[in-house]
Amino acid sequence: MERSYNMKKTTTTRQVLPHVRPPRLAAALLLAVCCASTLVAAPERGELVACRIETDRGVVPADKPETAIVKVTLAADRVASRERPPINLALVLDRSGSMGGEKIARAREAAIAAIRRLDGRDMVSVVVYDHEVETLVPAQPARNSEWIEGRIAQITARGNTALFAGLSQSASELRKNLDTGRINRAILLSDGLANTGPSSPDEVGRLGAALMKEAIAVTTIGVGTDYNEDLMTRVSGNSDGNSYFVEKSDDLPAIFTKELGDVLSVVASRVRLTVRFRAGATPIECIGRDGRIVDNTVTVDLNQLYGGQEKYLLIRVELAPGRDGETRLLADAEVNFEDATSRRSAQATAAGRIRFSRDAREVAESVNVPVSREYTLNRNAQELDRAVRLADEGRKEEAARVMRESAGRLEAAARSLDAPELEIEARRQNVQADSIGSRGMGKAERKLIVTDNYMLYNQQSK
């Protein structure tokens, strides 16, 4: 039997960009910590991607069924910039009428700054859209930067928003260089609702899923408070790209710089993680990522891994009763990927075990605080998603109640895990719940929640 789950994703470190809204604390709490439940395969010199398995507790109670949270982490090594793979980049820029003034000026500035970070190995194209689509710069080597920058400088705002058509055209430009060993990325910028052509999150999301199959990741950048954050995060999520909410257009250059830093640090592509659980362990739910569960095997596909960053998957697992003192093989993980520089296929593996005990103290002392905290934060994010849906339906009091109840669970976890950061997050969430309960959820507030949750679910750095 096959079960699919679309839940969602955190980062080892969070860097606050100049003038960009500070990250919600929840999104910055990942720690690289090993405990008794971990068989560590940390990246070593010459090892491109390492895999490791952890559980929320290294020891669980014996003689009865139990539930465990399994975390499978992929850690990518850093690669010197001179060794990086070439880039196949498409900039997809909204030039509709609402982008007038400072927005279009900052978008031009950010696009030009992005071009200047590329070199002669890289390919670049620029597509602009309003109610029509124009390929301003057909795919070509980035060394033609002076002419490309001149074309970008001519962009002016006008018309409506044919977002789907603009993204589709950018994919056509990227396809001209798909088989050249380059890292494929479209950066889609918009400040408004798609109102020409396909415009629903499902329709545009399907395009993102199709591009994922071609190893094209789509990063979305929403400017202001009038764009559709559900649509933008859907297309990014389905293609394994990043997503940003930029409240002030002045922040666009910093966001483009951050995004190009990610693209230029890709070390692995076409990544498939397979986790096979042993007898006595049944995977029930993927928490935070799109995961496919077939019998006792979980599979997740990622488009790319960035050097120096970690991506992980949380899986809720049911355990058959174990005897006191028994150590059981829990799961085997295998990650297959393509080295982004050499284009050779590679693999990394890991195995995980868990122990059973009647000693309650031994169980309590085996708690893996980082894994438990990440699980708590992801569950809280899912509750915030539920609050957003309730607020959308006009049920603001219920939305506030969901947020307060989830904040209460954060407070309890803060005490049991000795994690004061969770207490701070709970207080912030309670204040937010009071505001939403009295006046509803504003557009900017909704975008913050949706985008922050996306970044948490996807381990996207800020």
Annotate each PLM feature.
Residues 311, 319-462:
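Long, acidic serine/threonine- and proline-rich intrinsically disordered regions
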Residues 26-37:
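Bacterial N-terminal signal peptides
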Residues 134-137, 278-286, 340-344:
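Short aromatic-acidic-glycine turn motif
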Residues 49-51, 68-70, 87-89, 271-273, ...:
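Hydrophobic residues positioned within well-ordered beta-strands of beta-sheet architectures
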Residues 272, 276-295:
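A surface/secretory-pathway sequence property marking extracellular, secreted
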Residues 287-310:
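Extracellular adhesion/glycan-binding regions together with long Ser/Thr-
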